[in-house]
């Protein structure tokens, strides 16, 4: 895409990363109807599970996810109790339909204690019929990680860790309230590989406050030096009327459309030069990774978590605000954690 075309197409429209968009959801699908949809799935239908854990110990100002800050662990305990009830209810409707993929997002799943990582993973395996090979991915915040948690995630069956970086520039990090050094990130990547996790994804953002073209390229070089199998490069969406905490970002420090385009292109050029293949709009993968292979062979799919190679028949969302996709339609849980 040329710079002129990118600027011409710079319109305020719903993001391509989520479809259907928020205004399309309505209250017309009842709990009973959702249960029928689950039971109507063919017995051989493959299932992908998404588990939402909407808590962080601090809010990143750029975040557009359904999450809330808590400095106490008791709300998380109460939430996990309610989540267990939902898991058992959905599991009763799904029966022995095979689960082929599981993703934990948030929020910060890495905020969970070692005990709750183990008990939640155990509950999922006891409730659902896991296939022989299940891809288990989790979003990890390096600020939450401890030596004990690496082993806990490995014991839970983690196969891919997704780590948010956004940008390594200290000025940008202060502006978005996400302090995370390169050395800290490298330690997490090395530690998670040491316990046997074979795949790592790193998320980057462009269009952030005080971010520059050179800074985006520098971050891409640092990310590539960590050798993640996958990299996601998303554009920051500034919607303070929807996410009030984004009002902490001074709009005057945000790059314009031209600068955003150049940041994206600069980071892309670095990643491609480092051997990554571009996958769709916003993903990159090393040539041997399943995502790159699927892109080359036409087997790539996309869901609410981004691109995937898992050919599941239904995506089941668990937890507050979680979205599911079934042959009969899309569903979303209520946002409230109460």
Would you name each region that the model predicts?
Residues 1-47:
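Flexible, acidic/Gly-rich N-terminal and inter-domain linker regions that tether
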Residues 6-10, 58, 236-240:
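Short, compositionally biased low-complexity segments
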Residues 21-24, 59, 69:
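A short secondary-structure junction motif
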Residues 39-46, 69-93, 97-338:
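C-terminal scaffold of the Radical SAM
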Residues 51-67:
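Local cysteine-cluster metal-coordination motifs and their immediate loop/turn environment
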């Amino acid at each position: 895409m040329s710079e002129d075309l990118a600027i011409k197409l710079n319109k305020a429209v719903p993001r391509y990363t989520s479809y259907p968009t928020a205004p399309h959801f309505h209250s017309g699908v009842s709990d009973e109807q959702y249960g029928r949809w689950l039971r109507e799935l063919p017995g051989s239908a493959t299932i992908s599970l998404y588990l939402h854990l909407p808590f962080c110990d601090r809010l990143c100002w750029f975040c557009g996810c359904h999450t809330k800050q808590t400095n106490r662990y008791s709300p998380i305990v109460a939430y996990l109790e309610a989540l267990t009830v939902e898991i058992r209810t959905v599991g009763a409707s799904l029966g022995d339909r095979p689960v082929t993929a599981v993703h934990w997002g948030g929020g910060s799943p890495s905020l969970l204690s070692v005990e709750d990582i183990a008990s939640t993973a155990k509950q999922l395996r006891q409730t659902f019929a896991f296939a022989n090979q299940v891809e288990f991915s989790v979003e990890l915040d390096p600020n939450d990680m401890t030596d004990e948690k690496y082993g806990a995630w490995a014991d839970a069956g983690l196969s891919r860790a997704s780590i948010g970086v956004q940008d390594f520039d200290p000025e940008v990090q202060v502006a978005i309230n996400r302090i995370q050094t390169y050395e800290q990130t490298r330690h997490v990547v090395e530690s998670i590989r040491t316990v046997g996790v074979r795949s790592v994804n790193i998320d980057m953002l462009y269009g952030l406050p005080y971010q520059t073209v050179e800074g985006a390229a520098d971050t891409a070089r640092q990310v590539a030096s960590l050798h993640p199998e996958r990299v996601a490069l998303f554009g920051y969406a500034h919607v303070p009327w929807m996410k009030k905490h984004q009002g902490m970002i001074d709009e005057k420090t945000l790059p314009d459309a031209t600068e955003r385009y150049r940041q994206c292109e600069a980071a892309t050029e670095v990643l491609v030069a480092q051997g990554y293949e571009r996958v769709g709009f916003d993903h990159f993968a090393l040539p041997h990774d399943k995502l790159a292979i699927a892109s080359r062979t036409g087997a790539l799919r996309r869901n609410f978590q981004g691109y995937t190679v898992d050919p599941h028949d239904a995506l089941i969302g668990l937890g507050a605000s979680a979205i599911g996709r079934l042959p009969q339609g899309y569903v979303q849980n209520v946002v409230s954690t109460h």
